[in-house]
């Protein structure tokens, strides 16, 4: 199976009310931050970010992973345990879309979360940033459905 890394010009990222979207372009890479100041998390994409795998935790004593399987995508989270004395953690994720001809389209990213605050704000058992990741669309497929 062929794996392809999605670029920013191929996706549409919705912004939830009260969130901030910051795009930064420079000569080498492009960044996209979705900051949720009231929910205490930031979703972060970097155009040069590698596709993450379970090996992202090599050298860590404990880690966990979570997969959300949806009709049009699979979201794989790799969540290290919190460092003693810190309330924030960096989570890694891949969103995997099924492309044409059996290829897998990957969109990797990171989420900086204040664990205590985020866990208190789950809605129906769902972490607040999952809604953003569920609504990301591939532009090519958006054009075909319109």
Where are these regions (language model features)?
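Hydrophobic residues on conserved beta-strands that form the core of alpha/beta folds
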Residues: 8, 16, 70-72, 133
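Surface-exposed amphipathic alpha-helical segments
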Residues: 19, 107-146
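Compositionally biased, intrinsically disordered low-complexity segments
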Residues: 18, 34-37, 46, 54, ...
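Intrinsically disordered, low-complexity serine/threonine-rich segments
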Residues: 11, 50-51, 66-68, 132
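Secretory pathway targeting signatures of secreted, lumenal, and periplasmic proteins
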Residues: 2-61, 83-89
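Signature of long, low-cysteine stretches enriched in small and polar/charged residues
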Residues: 55-108, 141-145
């Amino acid at each position: 199976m062929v794996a392809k890394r999605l670029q920013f010009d191929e996706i549409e990222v919705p912004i939830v009310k009260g969130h901030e979207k910051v795009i930064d372009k420079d000569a080498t890479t492009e960044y996209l931050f979705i900051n949720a100041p009231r929910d205490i998390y930031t979703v972060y994409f970097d155009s040069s970010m590698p596709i993450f795998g379970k090996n992202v935790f090599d050298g860590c004593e404990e880690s966990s992973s979570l997969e959300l399987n949806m009709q049009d995508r699979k979201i794989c989270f790799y969540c290290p345990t919190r460092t003693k004395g810190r309330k924030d953690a960096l989570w890694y994720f891949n969103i995997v879309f099924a492309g044409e001809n059996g290829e897998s389209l990957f969109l990797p990213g990171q989420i900086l979360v204040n664990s205590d605050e985020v866990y208190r704000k789950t809605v129906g058992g769902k972490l607040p940033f999952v809604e953003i990741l569920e609504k990301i669309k591939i532009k090519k497929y958006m054009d075909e459905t319109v």
